């Protein structure tokens, strides 16, 4: 039976050095793997960065990716995050078109979704929202009804739940 393609989230702790991101990206491209999302930032230790990578692959391919990442120089730890024991979040910044007649409805939807309005002008609101992928997708779909001028979305970030 063929394995299904699924989305997987991998956390990679790396030494915070020049060229590490290029080596990780090169491993993916050199083996024909696609990175669906990638976030990189410092961890609690300034000498260590955390890469959160999502891929859409079969389980067997995921295992290969993890093994290959673990072999790279400057990689400290590779963890495959599973949905049940991990907290996932994303961030979206969206500029939504508004009119006098739609302004209150957009603001009400922002309140319902616990989004923050971070910039206002007569024809637009800039909104910041964090949450799960599903929550953000639904919010974006609702904002499309008003007209989205611009949007940027982070990939997933993740941490294991506290024990």
Locate the predicted segments by residue.
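Long, contiguous binding/interaction regions
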Residues: 1-50, 54-163
């Amino acid at each position: 039976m063929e394995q299904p393609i699924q989305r997987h989230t991998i956390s990679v702790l790396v030494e915070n050095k020049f060229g590490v991101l290029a080596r990780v990206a090169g491993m993916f491209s050199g083996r024909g793997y696609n990175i669906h999302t990638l976030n990189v930032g410092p961890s609690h230790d300034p000498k260590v960065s955390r890469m959160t990578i999502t891929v859409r692959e079969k389980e067997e391919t995921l295992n290969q990716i993890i093994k290959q990442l673990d072999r790279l120089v400057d990689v400290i730890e590779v963890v495959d995050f599973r949905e049940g024991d991990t907290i996932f979040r994303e961030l979206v910044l969206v500029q939504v078109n508004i009119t006098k007649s739609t302004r209150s409805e957009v603001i009400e939807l922002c309140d319902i979704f616990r989004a923050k309005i971070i910039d206002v002008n007569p024809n637009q609101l800039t909104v910041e929202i964090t949450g799960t992928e599903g929550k953000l997708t639904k919010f974006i779909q609702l904002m499309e009804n008003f007209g989205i001028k611009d949007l940027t979305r982070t990939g997933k970030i993740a941490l294991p739940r506290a024990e």
